[in-house]
From Swiss-Prot:
Subunit structure: Binds DNA as a homodimer and as a heterodimer. Can form stable heterodimers with CEBPA, CEBPB and CEBPE. Directly interacts with SPI1/PU.1; this interaction does not affect DNA-binding properties of each partner. Interacts with PRDM16.
GO biological process, one term: regulation of transcription by RNA polymerase II
Keyword Repressor: no
Gene name of this polypeptide: Cebpd
Protein name as catalogued: CCAAT/enhancer-binding protein delta
Protein family: Belongs to the bZIP family. C/EBP subfamily.
First and last residue of the signal peptide: none
Chief place of localization: nucleus
Source organism of the structure: Rattus norvegicus (Rat)
Gene Ontology molecular functions: DNA binding; DNA-binding transcription activator activity, RNA polymerase II-specific; DNA-binding transcription factor activity, RNA polymerase II-specific; identical protein binding; RNA polymerase II cis-regulatory region sequence-specific DNA binding; sequence-specific DNA binding; sequence-specific double-stranded DNA binding; transcription cis-regulatory region binding
Source species taxonomy: Eukaryota, Metazoa, Chordata, Craniata, Vertebrata
Length: 268
């Protein structure tokens, strides 16, 4: 059994790893900063690691893991092995954006409000120097489409202020008011009719004022006359009161006459 195992492993002993990269790796990536070692450098010449099967090729992902840990933005390597996974989604998004740019159907108003939100930054899946990689062009087209849709979704300011939908327009209410005011409005100030009206109004105002003044003066005059008459009456009352008092005093001082019969006797 050991001899059989030794016979199986003996052709691979001392044989280095294959130096040619597999079809999954892109050529021309050697020597770029920030990249891990290329698949051709995975195996050192002269290593004694045995190969399990000669007809199968192994893929070492340690280079991708090291490169992702070294880059702070955690961007994936620009390899075709990952590009195949994302080409379908990006091609579908790019086709939709190109249809909108080439005069396709307009988006509903709800989509414009979503496009105005913060845009999520997609990772850079490819470089310009990589042949056959359309991801940078698709990302640029998508960005331009989003910007154009956001600008088109913003409402343009109206040329004139529009009235609210719940209330009637302001131009309808002042119409009857203006008509009423126009019906009540008199003649022009320069017309003779206007002057005659003004003169008649002035005369009426003057008459009313003069009448009020005359009434006031008459009332004041009557007040003065009544006050003087009242004073005279008070004086007359006082005079009569004094006369009455003097007469009473005079009659009290008079003696009773003897020739007068006593009261209660008959003189006949």
């Amino acid at each position: 059994m050991s001899a059989a195992l030794f016979s199986l492993d003996s052709p691979a002993r001392g044989a280095p790893w294959p130096t040619e990269p597999a079809a999954f790796y892109e050529p021309g990536r050697v020597g770029k900063p920030g990249r891990g070692p290329e698949p051709g450098d995975l195996g050192e010449p002269g290593s004694t690691t045995p190969a399990m099967y000669d007809d199968e090729s192994a893929i070492d992902f340690s280079a991708y893991i090291d490169s992702m840990a070294a880059v702070p933005t955690l961007e994936l390597c620009h390899d075709e092995i990952f590009a195949d996974l994302f080409n379908s989604n990006h091609k579908a998004a790019g086709a939709g954006s190109l249809e909108l740019l080439q005069g396709g159907p307009t988006r509903p108003p709800g989509v414009g409000s979503i496009a105005r939100g913060p845009l999520k930054r997609e990772p850079d899946w490819g470089d310009g120097d990589a042949p056959g990689s359309l991801l940078p062009a698709q990302v640029a087209v998508c960005a331009q489409t989003v910007v154009s849709l956001a600008a088109a979704a913003q409402p343009t300011p109206p040329t004139s202020p529009e009235p609210p939908r719940g209330s009637p327009g302001p131009s309808l209410a002042p119409g009857p008011v203006r008509e009423k005011g126009a019906g009540k409005r008199g003649p022009d100030r320069g017309s003779p009719e206007y002057r005659q009206r003004r003169e008649r109004n002035n005369i009426a105002v003057r008459k009313s004022r003069d009448k009020a003044k005359r009434r006031n003066q008459e009332m004041q005059q009557k007040l003065v006359e009544l006050s003087a008459e009242n004073e005279k009456l008070h004086q007359r009352v006082e005079q009569l009161t004094r006369d009455l008092a003097s007469l009473r005093q005079f009659f009290k001082e008079l003696p009773s006459p003897p020739f007068l019969p006593p009261t209660g006797t008959d003189c006949r």
